[in-house]
Design a protein with these regions (language model features):
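Charge-rich, low-complexity N-terminal segments
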Residues: 1-44, 49-51, 57-58
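Charged, low-complexity, helix/coiled-coil-prone segments
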Residues: 8-9, 41-45, 75-87, 122
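Phenylalanine-focused residue identity feature
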Residues: 13, 56, 83, 102, ...
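Exposed alpha-helical structural elements
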Residues: 20, 24, 38, 101, ...
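Functionally constrained cores in energy, signaling, and assembly domains
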Residues: 47-48, 64, 84, 126
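Residue-level signal for functionally critical sites in structured catalytic/ligand-binding pockets
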Residues: 52, 65, 120
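Short, conserved beta-strand/beta-arch hydrophobic-aromatic motifs that form part
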Residues: 56-116
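Well-ordered alpha/beta subsegment
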Residues: 107-144
């Protein structure tokens, strides 16, 4: 018998019947919205055709995905006064990053990143997010 998933206590938007609007995000994130906004601005500067969509998860509530056509670029899980931002990079993108200006940071993050068949998952929050670093990660992802 499967157990029902438990909603995270920090979920910013836990109500499955109410999909959040984008204007509801900044008040929930508080000061955490600043590095996130810089990151999204960097993404849109790299690729102007990026779209976003809200989806619901029984564990984390409503989360937002950023897409280029059907390709998932970023996952944003809003939390109260925080967020979890994740992306998956393939081998070619990681190889490109290891040769670039963020090689040292990439190597450090690779030590704790989760490895999956489709690529390597990098996860950031309010404290660990560097918008310039994530901009380089997104540029590498889009280039491959």
């Amino acid at each position: 018998m499967k157990t029902k998933p438990v909603m995270a206590a920090t979920a910013a938007f836990p109500d499955p019947a109410h999909a959040p609007l984008d204007i509801e995000l900044p008040p929930v994130l508080g000061r955490a919205v600043i590095p996130l906004a810089l990151t999204i601005d960097n993404l849109r500067a790299i690729e102007s055709n990026v779209t976003s969509a809200w989806q619901f998860s029984p564990r984390s509530g409503w989360y937002k995905i950023y897409l280029l056509k059907k390709r998932r670029l970023l996952y944003l899980v809003p939390r109260r006064s925080d967020f979890r931002l994740s992306l998956i990079l393939g081998r070619k993108a990681v190889a490109e990053l290891r040769q670039g200006p963020f090689a040292r940071q990439t190597e450090r993050l690779l030590k704790t990143a989760k490895h999956y068949p489709e690529g390597i998952a990098f996860v950031f929050d309010r404290k660990t997010l560097d918008p310039d670093l994530l901009g380089a990660f997104l540029a590498a992802k889009l280039a491959t």
